[in-house]
């Protein structure tokens, strides 16, 4: 199978980039699919997550939208960026001729309905839709996508118009390590202090863990 992953900026050091690299490597190494990762934005930074040598990484070199306080100019800049990204993406997709195209992040949601291909178009939601400031623009993607993949069942409920919605949690490739010494009663959690990270739930869960150890 010929698989394409579309991501905003593969040079970013984030969770989406990490999971895309893991999936791409797994599809290629374990299932022997042909895999291409397409990075939309122009970014000269070194990529943080290594792809197998057999996986193609294509940069479309689309410049970022201009940052300005002028709302009209900002909107026009974003529209131009989107149209340029759609043009270059369609040109690249035509050359690759994939069987399935996975779209990620906000830009991916906007590009999916603009991508003209016979391949299956699947949107991977890596963020709860309600937390995305541009979620109101997801309607067209929702109707055009052959499927939407979410991380949780609660996330899946937010895509009522989609033809098919699947829940596939992110996998972890870090070996399980058992704690041998429970004498240390201190624990740390690292992450952005935002509602979507669920630190409130983590604190609640830790109460039960503390009782056991």
Located regions from the model:
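Conserved donor-binding/catalytic core segment of Leloir-type glycosyltransferases
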Residues: 4-6, 180-197, 203-207
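Short His-centered aromatic/hydrophobic patch
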Residues: 82-85, 103-109
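N-terminal strand-loop element at the rim of the active site
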Residues: 5-13, 26-76
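A short, basic/aromatic alpha-helical/loop segment that forms part
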Residues: 13, 174, 194-199, 212
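A conserved, positively charged/aromatic
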Residues: 93, 121-146
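Carbohydrate-associated surface elements
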Residues: 154, 171
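A structural motif in glycosyltransferase catalytic domains
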Residues: 20-23, 27, 187, 202-205
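A conserved nucleotide-sugar
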Residues: 32-34, 199, 203-213
């Amino acid at each position: 199978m010929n698989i394409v992953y579309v991501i905003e900026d593969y040079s970013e050091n984030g969770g989406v980039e990490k999971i895309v690299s893991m999936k791409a490597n797994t599809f290629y190494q374990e299932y022997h699919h042909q895999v291409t990762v397409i990075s939309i934005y122009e970014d000269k930074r070194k990529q943080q997550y290594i792809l197998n040598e057999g996986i193609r990484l294509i940069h479309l070199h689309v410049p970022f939208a201009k940052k300005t306080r002028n709302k009209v100019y900002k909107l026009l800049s974003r529209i131009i960026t989107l149209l340029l990204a759609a043009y270059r993406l369609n040109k690249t997709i035509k050359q690759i001729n994939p069987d399935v195209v996975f779209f990620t992040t906000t830009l991916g949601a906007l590009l999916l309905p603009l991508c003209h291909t016979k391949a299956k178009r699947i949107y991977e939601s890596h963020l709860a839709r309600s937390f995305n400031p541009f979620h109101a623009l997801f309607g067209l993607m929702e109707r055009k996508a052959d499927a939407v993949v979410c991380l949780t069942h609660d996330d899946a409920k937010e895509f009522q118009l989609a033809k098919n919605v699947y829940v596939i949690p992110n996998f972890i490739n870090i070996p399980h390590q058992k704690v041998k010494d429970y004498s240390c009663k201190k624990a740390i959690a690292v992450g952005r202090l935002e509602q979507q990270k669920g630190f409130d739930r983590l604190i609640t869960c830790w109460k039960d863990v503390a009782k056991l150890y």
